[in-house]
Amino acid sequence: MAHYFVGDVQGCFAELKRLLAEVDFNPSRDELWAVGDLVARGPDSLATLRYFQSLGDAGKTVLGNHDLHLLALHGKLKRDKPSDNLAPLLNAPDIASLIYWLRQQPLMRELPEHKVIMTHAGVPPQWSLDVLRQESQLVSQALKQGDYLDALISQMYSDTAERWDPSAIGLNRLRFCINALTRMRYLYVDGHLDFDCKQPPEDCNNPQLRPWFEFTSALRQSHTLVFGHWAALMGKVNDPKLKALDTGCCWGEYLTLWHLEKDQKITQKKLKKG
């Protein structure tokens, strides 16, 4: 069995299928792990979600910020932007089933036998594996509740929950987890989240900011961390225990697949229309 990890698909379904054909992916024996942001901007978010839903146990994804935003759009809490190319998905006859499936997906997954952890944006350097599991589970529980729209999704958009506080309770605790696992790129030197800078480290001109993965982390010493979200990195991080897989396919660059057992990356250039 092979484990394949794919970067932010964001509706680039044709490129995903090309990659899977190249590696002879077979869901009866292999597993496909996705770093989240299955939807938005690319041309076929609907086919992407349907495909992952159809994989059953052979498909593993985590929620990204665009996936959570889709929940808000479906709940009429936000207005759809034409640039997100989500109208076909939102108007699909099976949208309710797809949304229900999405709500069952976690913010983190792990492959214990390989000591691999996957989230969308990364892991706060202050967190141990036990804390990561615990905080992710709290959000998952909230998403599975019948009142998830009012209790969580309608209130998750906040830049104020930028600092980890283990004594926090309720919504602020959930907000920090969502912000950290789906939006994080840089931290200030005191450890709180920045939500503005999206540039690669070499282009960041704020001396108070450092990429989250440059902070000391016991978890990163013991595990390989697989993440996406930060397209500007283009997969370039100087640490063999970090696998940055967002390489900007929806922006005209590449979709990246990582074969765990071979420690090999395979890329597919964005296909031209027509």
Curated annotation (Swiss-Prot):
The gene is apaH. The keyword Hydrolase applies. GO terms for biological process: RNA decapping. The lineage of its organism: Bacteria, Pseudomonadati, Pseudomonadota, Gammaproteobacteria, Alteromonadales. InterPro entries: Ap4A_hydrolase, ApaH, Calcineurin-like_PHP_ApaH, Metallo-depent_PP-like. It comes from the Bacteria. Its EC number is 3.6.1.41. SUPFAM superfamilies: Metallo-dependent phosphatases. GO terms for cellular component: cytoplasm. It catalyses: P(1),P(4)-bis(5'-adenosyl) tetraphosphate + H2O = 2 ADP + 2 H(+). This is Bis(5'-nucleosyl)-tetraphosphatase, symmetrical. Hydrolyzes diadenosine 5',5'''-P1,P4-tetraphosphate to yield ADP. It comes from Shewanella sp. (strain MR-4). One of its GO terms (molecular function) is phosphatase activity. Transmembrane segments: none annotated. It is an enzyme of class 3 (hydrolase). Keywords: Hydrolase. Signal peptide: none annotated. Belongs to the Ap4A hydrolase family.
